Every structure is written in C-alpha cells, then in structure tokens.
Amino acid sequence: MKRIVFMGTPDFAVPVLQKLLELKYDIVLVVTQPDRPKGRKKVITPPPVKEEAIKHDLDIFQPEKLRDDYKKITDLKPDLIVTAAYGQILPKEILEIPTFGCINVHASLLPELRGGAPIHYAIMQGKEVTGVTIMYMAEKLDAGDILTQVEVPIEQDDHVGTMHDKLSLAGANLLSETLPSLFNNEITPKKQDESLVTFASNITREQERIDWSKTANEIINQIRGLHPWPVAFTTYEGKVMKIWWGQELSKSSKSGNIGEIIEKDTDGFYVQCGNNTVVKVSEIQPAGKKRMLVEDYLKGSQDRIKIGIKLGE
C-alpha cells in the first residue's frame, strides 16, 4: 500500500482525509496548521483535521513554518503527498520528496479562481457551475498541471456553507477515483491555460460591504457568497448591520433613492438598489445582537426598522 502524507487544516479537508482512511491508504503523517485562538474568549483550538486525525490515532505534525521545518516529512519518504486547504505554500524541497509527487484538492475548475476563497468568488460572480480540480502542486499558487476535474452545479439557494459541503464531498470522491489511475500512470497531466486564469484572493472587509448602487442580483450574489462567513454588511443609522439573507424582487410598487428602505412587511424590509431593482432583506444581525429573522426583530418594535432610512450611511 502506498505511503501518503496528508496535509490539510479546515473542515473542507476532513472528508478528504476520511476518504483516504476509508480506502485503507497508509496515512503515515497528517500535517496541519498549529492550534489557534478561536472565538471571543480566544480559546486555543485545534484545527478540524487534527481532531479527525486524533480519532484515528494518526501521527500529527503542526509546523509554524513548513518551509523551515520539513525534515520529518523527508525522513518518512512518502510515495505521495495529498493536500486540501492546508494553508501554506509547499516549498520546492517538499514538492520533490514523494515518488508520485504532491497533489492538491482545489475547490474550483482551474485555471479559474486560483487562491484561498474560490467558493466565495464563484457565488459572488453569479456562476451557475463550479467544481473541484485535482492537480499537481507547483511552487506558484494553484498553478500545477491538472489531473482530474468534476463539475458541481450551484443552485439559486446555495451559499458558501452549502457549496463548501458539496465541494468537499465531491473532492473526496474525485480523489478516490483519481488515485488508482495516478498510481498506475494512467493519467496524462494537462497544463493550465494561463490566458484563462482568474484569482480568488482572501476576502477583504471592503468586499463584505454592500454597495446598494449595484443591482439586486449582484447584491444577492454577494450575500450568498459571504454566507455564513464572513457575512455581508451595511450600516443602519451609522451602526453596522450584517445582512444574512434576502431575495431579489422582480418589481416593487414603490421606489426611492439608492440604499433607501422603501417598504416593510411582517417578515422583511425592502431596499432600493441600482437599475431600479429591489432587495427584500429577511435575516439580519443588528449591532450588538445575535443573528435573527427580520420578522422576529420587528416583533420587539416596528420602529426598529424605519421606512425612509438610507442604508450604508
């Protein structure tokens, strides 16, 4: 049985590790990021991959900087290194260790959406299809030759959370189909077309801010593409209000200035957007409060949401 070093950190990588274990591959080492402070109380918390590895009594390695600390991997002489959302770029010295190379499970159809937030960008850009790519690792980010790919449709009610789970499982299944062919030298790697490269760099605070001058469709894609993390936001009377969910309306009986609340009902409020479009907001997180339905928020007082207020100011 081939000796595999697995490298991954967040929830996305867990099904990939589980699949390798299910298929009885010899996981000689799990490399993951160091434990980090988490939550408001900054409790030191192990990454999900470490928690999964502990369940299976696997050897775990958590270097702060892999580039400076990889002798343990070299000494193991693995046949293959499999990575999935590990969080550090592998240096050339590591790429050259395994007989069958280093392969990565990436949540996009490369060469589109290289980088750390491909699921967010796929939804924010309004794509109807994304997918998973398994490719060789290269010194340049997500630029290695492609081994296999699978498409995964994005439904209208999908968001980052649902697509994260779909793509994670799709990646695990694709890996299980890819490895036998890889080990039997039955795959011809395909170079990425550099003219088609796009990037999905980590989400910035400004990308989380809703620009109400955009169309309702663009804003809903932004909300879906930032749900459930890091979450789109606006301001209401100068205070941050996170927008967890809403819907695009084909038309409204009323209109107003861009960003203005033009109407409300029992379960939402309506915001004027660009190109004479309207978004109905149905789930929010007001400043200093928990996430809640607008319906529940308004039960406290109808005055909590006022018609005529302009969001984003």
UniProtKB/Swiss-Prot annotation:
Keyword Protein biosynthesis appears in the UniProt entry: yes
EC supergroup of this enzyme: transferase
The EC number(s) this enzyme carries: 2.1.2.9
PROSITE patterns attached to this UniProt entry: GART
Gene3D superfamilies: Formyl transferase, C-terminal domain, Formyl transferase, N-terminal domain
Keyword Transit peptide applies: no
Any one GO MF annotation of this record: methionyl-tRNA formyltransferase activity
Ligand binding ((6S)-5,6,7,8-tetrahydrofolate): 108-111
Reactions listed under catalytic activity: L-methionyl-tRNA(fMet) + (6R)-10-formyltetrahydrofolate = N-formyl-L-methionyl-tRNA(fMet) + (6S)-5,6,7,8-tetrahydrofolate + H(+)
Database matches in InterPro entries: Fmt, Formyl_trans_C, Formyl_trans_C_sf, Formyl_transf_N, Formyl_transf_N_sf, Formyl_transferase-like_C_sf, GART_AS, Met-tRNA-FMT_C
The entry's keywords: Protein biosynthesis, Transferase
One term under GO cellular component: cytosol
Family per record: Belongs to the Fmt family.
Function: Attaches a formyl group to the free amino group of methionyl-tRNA(fMet). The formyl group appears to play a dual role in the initiator identity of N-formylmethionyl-tRNA by promoting its recognition by IF2 and preventing the misappropriation of this tRNA by the elongation apparatus.
Protein name as catalogued: Methionyl-tRNA formyltransferase
Annotated source species: Oceanobacillus iheyensis (strain DSM 14371 / CIP 107618 / JCM 11309 / KCTC 3954 / HTE831)
